[in-house]
Each structure stands twice: as C-alpha cells, then as structure tokens.
Design a protein with these regions (language model features):
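Hydrophobic alpha-helical scaffolding
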Residues: 19-22, 47-51, 102, 106
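Catalytic phosphate/nucleotide-handling subdomain of diverse soluble enzymes
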Residues: 31-98
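Alpha-helical structural motif
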Residues: 10, 25, 57, 74-77, ...
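Short, small-residue-biased leader/transition segments that mark boundaries at the very start
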Residues: 2-7
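Structural signal for terminal/edge beta-strands and the immediately following C-terminal loop/tail
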Residues: 91-122
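Conserved active-site and cofactor/substrate-binding residues in soluble primary-metabolism enzymes
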Residues: 24-28, 52, 56, 107-111
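Residues that form generic nucleotide/phosphate-binding pockets
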Residues: 10, 14, 60, 64, ...
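Generic long, charged, amphipathic alpha-helical segments
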Residues: 11-29, 35
Length: 122
C-alpha cells in the first residue's frame, strides 16, 4: 500500500509541477530515481525513458492526479486524460469503444483453472 501511494504521489507531483501525465511504470522508475538521488547525493543527469502509455492505466493515473476520478467510467476517464494531457487517444484505445464484447464470463478465483480448461476444450 505504501508503494502504491509513492507511485500515486509521483504521478500527481509530476503532473502538478510539469503538466506531464506519466504512466504507472514510468512513475515507478521516477520514484526510484528520486529515492536514489536523495540517498546518494548523485547529481548526474539522468534520462528516464517512458515505455508505457498512461491510457493503458487511465484509472490509476487519473485517480493519482485527483481522487475525484476514482469512480469514473472508463471511457470518461480516457476522454479526461486526453483533455488534461493534450495527447491524442491511441487508435487501439479508441477502437475498443465500439468493439463487441467477445467474452463476458466472470468466475471466482477457485474456478479459474477449470474455466480455462473448458475454454481450451481440455
């Protein structure tokens, strides 16, 4: 839980200071780097390469920025992320708005193995 708060805090802090919306993976790297700097005093310039999209983690990213987004509808959060970041919604994310739901099976944890076997016809 403490790690999650650290990541949430990093996303919020960077957004508030720089207007940049970072994804959860990049927030981990950024938080680890900040901790490293604080512990070592190392001032070497560092580049953190973001390899994930905040759109993949829209709920986590948006609720880190402001708790008012915690219960938002997924596509509303994506639209708001686009608005605040100024970054176009990726085509793959946009396409799922109208995609047909192919699987809607919900199972309890203890039923997962058997359900997968049934899907595979085994």
């Amino acid at each position: 839980r403490q790690r999650q708060m650290c990541i949430r805090d990093r996303i919020k802090s960077v957004y508030e200071s720089d207007g940049y919306v970072m994804d959860t993976h990049t927030a981990v790297a950024s938080a680890v780097y900040e901790k490293y700097k604080a512990e070592t005093g190392d001032t070497t310039k560092t580049l953190i390469a973001s390899t994930a999209s905040p759109y993949k983690f829209a709920r986590s990213v948006m609720s880190a920025i402001d708790s008012k987004y915690e219960n938002g509808e997924d596509f509303a959060l994506i639209d708001e992320l686009c608005r605040i970041s100024g970054v176009k919604i990726p085509a793959a994310v946009e396409e799922i708005r109208s995609a047909a739901v192919l699987h809607n099976t919900v199972v309890d944890r203890d039923e997962m193995k058997q359900t997968v076997l049934e899907f595979l016809g085994l």
